[in-house]
Curated annotation (Swiss-Prot):
Protein name: Large ribosomal subunit protein uL10
CDD domains found in the cross-reference section: Ribosomal_L10
Sorted UniProt keywords: Ribonucleoprotein, Ribosomal protein, RNA-binding, rRNA-binding
Family to which the UniProt record says this protein belongs: Belongs to the universal ribosomal protein uL10 family.
Quaternary structure annotation from Swiss-Prot or TrEMBL: Part of the ribosomal stalk of the 50S ribosomal subunit. The N-terminus interacts with L11 and the large rRNA to form the base of the stalk. The C-terminus forms an elongated spine to which L12 dimers bind in a sequential fashion forming a multimeric L10(L12)X complex.
GO terms under cellular component: large ribosomal subunit
GO MF terms, alphabetically ordered: large ribosomal subunit rRNA binding; structural constituent of ribosome
Any one Pfam family match given in the protein's UniProt record, by short name: Ribosomal_L10
Length: 176
């Protein structure tokens, strides 16, 4: 690759690192072109999967302000640049790797923080952002319902107590 081509490739990779929420580095050795196409389709529109040159990717990551360990750049490397929900893309990669053991997740980056392969797998185990937000909203709604029940119970309990006191006074007044 000529020097101007390398500079253009580094600039493009740097831009991808900067515009992505996450990037997952994988080793794809042994995968067929058809399997790579299937992987790209399974990642959907929120991620772009690209086979990259290790040296250029390392330079681009550094220019984007991302520090990655050198061991991530051993062997043939491809990067999934994620612009959408990183959980969904991590799940897609994990599921594909289960069916195709030749795909090895090496590690990655999430919001500028380096992640190990195990952390990527833990990320894949999380529920999507929408599901987590709906659970949080449900928890808030349940707490509001509980608070409303307590506030409704207080006045009715007070009324019952006052009625009981009146009845008791009426009995005592009638007994005398």
């Amino acid at each position: 690759m000529a020097r101007p081509d390398k500079a253009a490739a580094v600039a493009e990779l740097t831009d991808k690192f900067r515009s992505s929420n996450a990037a997952v580095l994988t080793e794809y050795r042994g995968l067929t072109v058809a399997q790579l196409k299937t992987l790209r389709r399974s990642l959907g529109e929120n991620a772009q999967y690209a086979v990259v040159k290790n040296t250029l990717t390392k330079i681009a990551a550094k220019e984007a302000g991302i520090t990655l360990e050198d061991q991530l750049f051993a062997g043939p490397t491809a990067v999934a640049f994620v612009t959408g929900d990183p959980v969904e893309s991590a799940k897609g990669l994990r599921d594909f790797a289960k069916e195709n053991p030749n795909l090895v997740i090496k590690g990655g980056v999430l919001d500028g923080k380096a992640l190990s392969a195990d952390e990527i797998k833990k990320l894949a185990d999380l529920e999507s952002r929408e599901v987590l937000l709906s659970k949080l909203a449900g928890a808030f709604k349940a707490k509001q319902s509980q608070a409303a029940s307590v506030f409704q119970a207080l006045p009715s309990k007070l009324v019952r107590t006052v009625d009981a006191l009146r009845a008791k006074q009426a009995e005592q007044g009638g007994a005398e």
